């Protein structure tokens, strides 16, 4: 059964973004302070070796953080519910994590960089 799941997940993966777990958790917590309370939507933009994490709330303002990342591929943008992502990230033990994406409409696969012991899948949000 596990082989079938991995085969399906591989179909979705086009780009791999490598991040330091603690740094991304800290950035997400700060950016989420400004996110809409109902959706907790956070936008991820990856380009030129940088990940830009941003959110906004009408009437309050916006937040933005940049983090260097290991990434090769075309520029990509996608949205995620920060609460779901934080739940996954705090459950992982590795120093680095991998966000694996195909585009902004397909599931995002999250796992430790050097391990496939735990694999999480989060559906993106349309922003």
PLM regions with names:
Residues 1-127:
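Extended macromolecule-engaging scaffold surfaces
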């Amino acid at each position: 059964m596990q082989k079938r799941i991995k085969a399906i997940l591989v179909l979705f993966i086009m780009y791999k973004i490598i991040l330091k777990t603690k740094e991304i958790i800290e950035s997400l917590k700060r950016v989420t302070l400004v996110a809409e309370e109902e959706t907790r939507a956070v936008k991820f933009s990856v380009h030129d070796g940088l990940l830009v994490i941003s959110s906004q709330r009408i009437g309050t303002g916006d937040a933005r953080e940049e983090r260097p990342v290991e990434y090769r591929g075309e520029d990509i943008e996608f949205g995620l519910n920060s609460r779901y992502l934080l739940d996954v990230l705090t459950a992982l033990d590795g120093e680095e994590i991998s966000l694996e994406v195909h585009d902004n409409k397909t599931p995002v696969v999250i796992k430790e960089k050097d391990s496939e012991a735990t694999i999480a899948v989060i559906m993106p949000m349309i922003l």
